[in-house]
Amino acid sequence: MDNMNHEELNDQLLVRREKLHNLREQGIDPFGKRFERTNATNDLLSLYGEFSKEELEEKEISVSIAGRIMTKRGKGKAGFAHIQDLHGQVQIYVRKDAVGDEEYELFKTADLGDLVGIEGKVFKTNVGELSVKATGFTLLTKSLRPLPDKYHGLKDVEQRYRQRYLDLITSMESRETFVTRSKIIREMRRYLDDNGYLEVETPMMHAIAGGASARPFITHHNALDMELYMRIAIELHLKRLIVGGLEKVYEIGRVFRNEGVSTRHNPEFTMIELYEAYADYKDIMKLTENMVAHIAKQVLGTTTIQYGDYEINLEPKWTRLHMVDAIKEHSGADFWNPMSVEEARELAKEHNVEIKDTMEVGHIINEFFEQKVEDKLIQPTFIYGHPVEISPLAKKNDEDPRFTDRFELFIVAREHANAFTELNDPIDQKERFEAQLKEREQGNDEAHMMDDDYIEALEYGMPPTGGLGIGIDRLVMLLTNAPSIRDVLLFPAMRHKQD
């Protein structure tokens, strides 16, 4: 900001503070009291928008509305303004002879951004705009800072994220995104509740970071003098509940991963995890596609959505593709025949797939998938059959134990869900954890820790179980056509602002 703009802004701040002082001198509270509203702006349009000018004059409909002044014009003894609430804007018409000298003076000196209450009659202007003719004007909150330019809103994307309140004031699209987010989560809950699932709450601070491959945030509990980890997944506590006999459970909550920030990643994000006893990953596939289609229908009214340049069809049944078949289809590499790690590394070299020296065959298969296949999966696709090495909590496949009964859901080349037939053999689970510990020793700090308490829970017997995790932020991105995860998080993680 140059010096001239800086001085101009200071002048505006001073003028508004002077108005604040004058209001107090007159005995008017610039940060007023409760105001009774009869209608929101969208109510007025839906209830009275179809009435003619003459019908409204005849009916003399009285309303009481409140909102923020977004535009203002007029001089002398009358003026117009648009006030905005959550749902939109409506025009108000204020005449001195209708509201009186004192209230008209309040209107005249009001600034853009001030919050006001209006009592009046609904009417239509000569050009047909539904409006409210004020009979009363109340200042509810004096705004001490000018809003961003009303014609351009917030052009600085970073400012939109840092000062989300300004973004919400100036962008109806942004407000609609977050209202839609709330509706998506509400419909998800409704769908699961209606299908017999029980919503539960489990700890966010864990003694052991488990349930996913990720770096945790670490904190310290002073009273207990112990390190705790902010949860990287909800999984292991929910599966303990399955052991305890709660047969269908879910939790919607925050998860924390001490990793990079990108258009798809935020260090804290919202997940839903659910588990169902006596089910497997194929049952969870059906649940996933039916639930997402239900949410789209209820919230958007359609299962055909636009995301960027793509038209996406969310109507079940979605494509199901084994990871090895997907790799073969898109790269020609065939991992169906068992091979040594040396042969797998040679195949990676042949196909220009980057790998690390510590990787086993299963890791290399996964690298093939991520580098050769993932970005081609646009329409909803269940990729199943992940290698055992990268799936320490999933049950081995009966027909080919190199792979697991696990799937990931990909839409627009992004992972949206991860699901297993859960591993319920405590001996196998302990061996998997031990293999993960070896990976940690070799430098993989995202490998799973040993969790003896969870092993003990499994030893009491967990029924065959299907489990699912969905990243809610990414689902909201998909259903609102948002290009970045920051567009669907009210307050995304940001670096400290540089002065």
Swiss-Prot record:
Q: Name one GO biological process term.
A: lysyl-tRNA aminoacylation
Binding positions (Mg(2+) 1): 408, 415
Q: Which UniProt keywords apply?
A: Aminoacyl-tRNA synthetase, ATP-binding, Cytoplasm, Ligase, Magnesium, Metal-binding, Nucleotide-binding, Protein biosynthesis
Q: Where does Mg(2+) 2 bind?
A: 415
Signal peptide span:
none
Q: Where is this protein found? A: Cytoplasm
Among CDD domains, the record links this protein to:
LysRS_core, LysRS_N
Q: Which domain of life is it from?
A: Bacteria
The cofactor remark states: Binds 3 Mg(2+) ions per subunit.
* Cofactor(s) of this protein: Mg(2+)
The UniProt family comment states: Belongs to the class-II aminoacyl-tRNA synthetase family.
PANTHER family, A to Z: LYSINE--TRNA LIGASE, CHLOROPLASTIC_MITOCHONDRIAL, LYSYL-TRNA SYNTHETASE
- The name this protein carries in UniProt is Lysine--tRNA ligase
Source organism of the structure? Bacillus cereus (strain AH820)
Q: What gene is it encoded by?
A: lysS
